C-alpha cells in the first residue's frame, strides 16, 4: 500500500469508462476498432501514467511510440500482467474496467511530505444528497464507510449538520466550482481531495449516477470507502484484494472488514488503534451471550414473525424463536447473528413466499432474500417494491397465499404488493383499522396460517378471519412461545 506522496489539494476520481469490458485483440481487430482502442489507450495512459505537468491527451503520438510502450509496460507491471509493451487483449480489458481516477504513478507533488491529518477527531458534513437514495441510506453508507477506516486507526469522525467540516460531502452536477467538473452518467463517479486546508478532504459524488446500497447501480459504500481512503492520505495499492485497488469492485457493506493491505497503509500514516483493555478479568471468563428477553412478561411483543419452511420464526431484539406450528414443545431461542449474520440484530419485518422457496427480511430501508437460512446476495433497497421515498422502514409484512399478495404495514396504514406482477397495487396505502375490523393499534408483525391472518400488536395477537372479515379471537403474544 502506498501513501500519497504530497499534501494539499491533490484530487482523485473514480471512473466508469463508457465502454464494454470485453475487447478483441488489436491484432485481429478491424481498422476502426483498432483506432478506437488505440485512442482509448492513449487517453488512459496519458491520464494515469503521465505527470500532471506533462503533455495532455492527444500529444502522446507526437512524442513517439517509445513513450507509449514505456507507459504500457508500467501499466502491465502495476496490474501484474505479462510485461510486453503491447496492447494485447488482457491489457485492453484492464483499460476498459471501471476504476478510480487517481493515477497509478506519483504525480501530485504540491507540498513536501506525505499528506495526513494532524488531529485525531475529524468532522464531516453531508451538505447535498442524491435523489437515487433516501437521506437515511446515504447517511448510513457514509457512516459505515468512515467506520471501516476508524476501526483500524486512532481516528474519530463526528458528524455536524451546519458550518464547515473537515470533510465536506456532497452530490454535485457538472461544473461545481472545484475545477474538476463531472461529466454525466457512467463517466467520473466521484472525486476526493487529499488532507489539507480548504478543499482538503472534501469528497464529491456525481449526482447524475444511479447510487445504491446494493448492486443495481454504483454502490455508494464501496465508492465512498475508497474515496475516504484518498481523503485520509492513501494512494492506490497493487493488491487486487485491497479496497484501494484502482478498479471498481463491489464490497458488501454489511460485515465488511478492511483488507490487510489497507490496514498496513492507513496505519503507516496514523498508527494502530489502541484498544483499552479496562480492569483485569479472571482467566477464562465466560463469554456473555445476548440476554433473552422475558417474553412471558404481560407487556411483551414481537418485532417480526414469519414461516420459514416448516418452522415458525418469531423475532425480538437480537433473539428469535423457532417452533413447529402445531407443537408447543421444542421451542428454542437462538441469536439472529448465529443464523443470519448479515442481519446482525433487530429485524423489522419478515415474510415467506413458500411457492418460490424464498423469504424476505426487512431492516430499515433494506431487505435481504433467503432460501432457508442461506442469504441470497447483498442487501437491496425497499424502494425496489415501489414504496414512496418517505417510507423509511416496514413495521410488518404478511404474504397471503390465495391472492398471491403481500401486505406491508407502515404506521397506521398498509400497502398491497402483487407478487405475480411484482408491482405495488394502486389506491394504497389504506387505513389498517378501517380495513381490518377488530384489529386495534399499530401492527408489529403478521403471519398467515391455515387461512387466518394473525396480527401481532404489542402484547396482543388478533386472529383475523378473512372470510368473515372480522377478528375471531385475541390471545397474548407471549403464548406463541409457550408462556
UniProtKB/Swiss-Prot annotation:
Cysteine switch, short sequence motif: residues: 98-105
Requisite cofactors: Zn(2+); Ca(2+)
Gene3D superfamilies, A to Z: Collagenase (Catalytic Domain), Hemopexin-like domain
Enzyme's top EC category: hydrolase
Disulfide bond sites: 296-483
Keyword Phosphoprotein: no
SUPFAM superfamilies, per the entry: Hemopexin-like domain, Metalloproteases ('zincins'), catalytic domain, PGBD-like
InterPro entries (UniProt xref): Hemopexin-like_dom (IPR000585), Hemopexin-like_dom_sf (IPR036375), Hemopexin-like_repeat (IPR018487), M10A_MMP (IPR033739), MetalloPept_cat_dom_sf (IPR024079), Pept_M10_metallopeptidase (IPR001818), Pept_M10A (IPR021190), Pept_M10A_Zn_BS (IPR021158)
Cofactor note: Binds 2 Zn(2+) ions per subunit. Binds 2 calcium ions per subunit.
Hemopexin repeats: 293-343, 344-389, 391-439, 440-483
Binding residue positions for Zn(2+) 2: 176, 178, 191, 204
Tissue: Expressed specifically in the enamel organ.
Notes on the domains: The conserved cysteine present in the cysteine-switch motif binds the catalytic zinc ion, thus inhibiting the enzyme. The dissociation of the cysteine from the zinc ion upon the activation-peptide release activates the enzyme.
Family: Belongs to the peptidase M10A family.
Protein name per Swiss-Prot or TrEMBL: Matrix metalloproteinase-20
Species whose genome carries this gene: Homo sapiens
Lineage: Eukaryota, Metazoa, Chordata, Craniata, Vertebrata
This protein's encoding gene: MMP20
